């Protein structure tokens, strides 16, 4: 069964001096998050960016995928924590998301370091957000 989620953004002004707002239109769990070009390319200063939202989506997705993999291996986690750092940089073709670095830790009774690593590798390959960016962005 397919699911569809919707987000909306508005932008006012030009790229450099303008500003925007992002809303989770399906759930409204967040609304009118401010965003600016400066938040994307310099300091965030309390303002989000598409790259930060991508990192949040990836971290959330990855945490679900690794939890599922660990449970399927017979070692359901008590807790997993996932941090994703998305790096964008200016290239000859313009600004590009270049990599997503994933850091994972957890409390997983009965799991070995090897089985945890195997579950993480499976999550890297199986998480739908990882799949969406794989081939375009370096995943580590």
Task: Please describe what each predicted stretch is.
Residues 1-56, 63-140:
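Extended beta-strand/beta-hairpin segments
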């Amino acid at each position: 069964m397919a699911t569809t989620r919707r987000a909306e953004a508005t932008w006012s002004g030009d790229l450099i001096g303008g500003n925007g707002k992002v809303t989770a239109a399906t759930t409204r769990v967040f609304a009118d998050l401010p965003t600016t070009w400066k938040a994307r390319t310099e300091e965030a200063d309390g303002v989000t960016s598409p790259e930060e939202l991508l990192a949040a989506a990836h971290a959330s997705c990855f945490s679900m995928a690794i939890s599922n993999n660990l449970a399927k291996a017979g070692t359901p986690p008590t807790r997993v924590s996932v941090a994703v750092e998305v790096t964008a940089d200016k290239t000859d073709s313009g600004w590009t998301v270049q990599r997503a670095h994933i850091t994972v830790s957890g409390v997983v009774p009965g799991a070995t370091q090897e089985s945890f690593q195997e579950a993480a590798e499976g999550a890297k390959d199986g998480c739908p957000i990882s799949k969406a960016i794989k081939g375009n962005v370096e995943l580590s």
